Regions:
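Conserved catalytic alpha/beta core of Sir2/sirtuin-type deacylases, generalized to analogous enzyme cores
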Residues: 1-155
Length: 155
């Protein structure tokens, strides 16, 4: 597996056993905090504990900047290194699986095209049509919670 690129921020891919080195959480995650000023990062539990201890609005210990969960907020730029890692994974994939995504939000929507141009097969599992359905080697319509267990049972 070249990698897993997810737009989810819930950390379930890690809990399911995906290697951190192969995981790209393109919209960030809720496990960490990030300072909006200096970029300092750490476990979100540290900030939560500071709130529990009485701090109303914990500030960055490095620069006194504003802390937030390490998720991408509306209007905030994606992390360039994450985009690069996602594009690199797409470029070396033998089979690119697009699961549970409309493939309409860029830059993630461009990943299947990168994979196809590199010679990858494309399979799409989604409840609705996507712009890449006509280019896919396989398209499965349905709810991923039902479709994926059925696929796993066949393998």
């Amino acid at each position: 597996m070249a990698g897993v690129v997810t737009q989810n921020v819930d950390g379930l891919h890690l809990k399911a056993g995906t290697s951190p080195e192969r995981l790209v959480e393109i919209h960030g995650n809720t496990r960490e905090f990030v300072c909006m000023a200096c970029g300092d990062r750490g476990p979100i539990d540290v900030v939560v504990e500071r709130v529990r201890s009485g701090e109303e609005d914990p500030r960055c210990l490095e620069c006194n900047g504003i802390l937030k969960s390490a998720t991408i907020s509306f209007g905030q730029n994606l992390v360039p290194e994450d985009i690069d890692r996602a594009q690199s994974a797409a470029a070396v994939a033998d089979c690119f699986l697009a699961i549970g995504t409309s493939l309409t939000v860029y830059p993630v929507a461009a990943m299947p095209e990168i994979a196809l141009r590199a010679g990858s097969n494309l399979a799409i599992v989604n409840a609705e049509e996507t712009p890449y359905d006509a280019y896919a080697d396989a398209v499965i319509r349905g709810q991923i919670g039902e479709v994926l267990p059925a696929i796993v049972a066949l393998v």
